[in-house]
């Protein structure tokens, strides 16, 4: 039953990504992929991803999450990379940037506001990370979204 539900969820996520890709191509917009967590049996990885989703706006890092889960940073780092294909920090950054891309589609919102809403107090650093992952600046992304 859980396996069937997971397959349905993955299929829906795949369809959403396909639609995002199609829309992005039509608008010449970059697409940022964030692989869904694989069929993991590791409860710590599931819990870590859930903590990222709940606290990405805050000052969260592998140390705070490992502490919350009462496991070592080294262990969390190893299993997280194995299960997601990303380091913890890379996953967190990509998650934040996907959220930022969604927020930037509203042309009324300022880049510094988006940066703050996705957990960055330094707008320049946010912009550099955004450009590194998408190939364009947040303001250019916002302009293309119009």
Regions found by a protein language model. Name each.
Residues 44-45, 97, 135:
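Hydrophobic alpha-helical segments
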Residues 49-50, 54, 82-121, 143-146:
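Terminal helix-turn-helix DNA-binding modules in bacterial transcription factors
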């Amino acid at each position: 039953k859980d396996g069937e539900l997971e397959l349905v969820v993955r299929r829906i996520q795949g369809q959403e990504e396909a639609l995002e890709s199609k829309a992005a191509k039509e608008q010449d917009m970059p697409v940022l992929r964030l692989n869904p967590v694989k069929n993991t049996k590791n409860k710590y990885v599931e819990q870590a991803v859930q903590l990222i989703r709940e606290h990405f706006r805050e000052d969260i890092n592998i140390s705070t999450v490992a502490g919350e889960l009462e496991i070592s940073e080294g262990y969390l780092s190893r299993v997280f990379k194995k299960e997601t294909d990303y380091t913890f920090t890379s996953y967190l950054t990509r998650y934040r940037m996907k959220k930022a891309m969604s927020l930037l589609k509203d042309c009324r919102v300022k880049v510094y506001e988006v940066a703050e809403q996705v957990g960055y107090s330094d707008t320049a650093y946010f912009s550099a990370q955004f450009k590194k992952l998408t190939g364009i600046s947040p303001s250019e992304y916002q302009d293309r979204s119009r």
